[in-house]
């Protein structure tokens, strides 16, 4: 689940990251191959590839797997993927954005629609919910990078627009076209970030109750387990008391 949300914490505590690790590697490798195919195979000369490689390293993807994904882009047998965004509403009207990378658009569209229908949602048209989100760059640092004031000052100097800090880390937001520039400026002051990526940031988040959270988790699990789905983002947050019950 993309974005700074309690969802990520629940996902971690429930061990979902381990369960999805092989799928995560596969999806990241696909992004690396596509990024390298669309631009230069050298990450230093290809901003999208640089971010993809950084994301792969953040989840400890082996170096040889990363190199193999880049090499695959230069071969004549590299698949052609279409990048399609789907938008809709989940249970209780929660807005959901699903980003996919597929070699069969009909298959993916059918699958995504079926997940929404099965788990109490409704797939809409492109633009039906994205107006409730901002497309921004998100740079993540661990708490050890500094206190909130230190990170805030560094972010302002680097040209960032917003910072969210708590005991689990710092999330720095910037314009989608300035992600690489801001990320590089921050590295000079705070060191290398944990992650830097483009995200759909909700303009407002809705706190959900236990029943809604359970329904949302089923929908998001189904989407994230689909090989064609790269990211899933929603405009909701799960309060700590609800999260504790989900973990029980």
UniProtKB/Swiss-Prot annotation:
Subcellular location: Cytoplasm
SUPFAM superfamilies for this protein: YebC-like (SSF75625)
GO BP annotations listed: regulation of DNA-templated transcription
Lineage top rank: taxon: Bacteria
GO CC term (a single one): cytosol
Name the UniProt record assigns to this protein: Probable transcriptional regulatory protein Rsph17029_2308
Principal location: cytoplasm
Molecular function via GO: DNA binding
Keywords: Cytoplasm, DNA-binding, Transcription, Transcription regulation
Family recorded in the similarity comment: Belongs to the TACO1 family.
HAMAP family in UniProt: Transcrip_reg_TACO1 (MF_00693)
PANTHER family in UniProt: TRANSCRIPTIONAL REGULATORY PROTEIN YEBC-RELATED, TRANSLATIONAL ACTIVATOR OF CYTOCHROME C OXIDASE 1
Protein's organism: Cereibacter sphaeroides (strain ATCC 17029 / ATH 2.4.9)
Signal peptide region: none
Region (Disordered): 1-21
């Amino acid at each position: 689940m993309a974005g700074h949300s309690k969802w990520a914490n629940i996902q971690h505590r429930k061990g979902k990251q381990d369960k999805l690790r092989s799928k995560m590697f596969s999806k990241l490798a696909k992004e690396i191959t596509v990024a390298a195919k669309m631009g230069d195979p050298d990450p230093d000369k290809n901003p999208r590839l640089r971010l993809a490689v950084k994301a792969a390293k953040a989840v400890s993807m082996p170096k040889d797997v990363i190199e193999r994904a880049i090499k695959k882009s230069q071969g004549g047998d590299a698949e052609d993927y279409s990048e399609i965004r789907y938008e809709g509403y989940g249970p209780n009207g929660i807005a959901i954005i699903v980003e996919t990378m597929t070699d069969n658009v009909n298959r993916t569209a059918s699958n995504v629609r079926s997940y929404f229908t099965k788990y109490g949602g409704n797939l809409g048209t492109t633009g039906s919910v994205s107006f409730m989100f901002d497309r921004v760059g998100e740079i993540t640092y661990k708490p050890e990078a500094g206190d909130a004031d230190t990170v805030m000052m560094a972010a302002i100097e680097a040209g960032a627009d917003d910072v969210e800090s708590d005991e689990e880390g710092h999330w720095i937001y910037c314009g989608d076209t300035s992600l690489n520039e801001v990320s590089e400026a921050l590295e000079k002051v705070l060191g290398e970030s944990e992650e830097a990526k483009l995200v759909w940031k909700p303009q407002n988040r809705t706190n959900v109750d236990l029943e809604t959270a359970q329904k949302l988790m089923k929908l998001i699990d189904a989407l994230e387990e689909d090989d064609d789905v790269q990211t899933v983002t929603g405009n909701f947050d799960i309060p700590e008391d609800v999260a504790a019950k989900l973990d029980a």
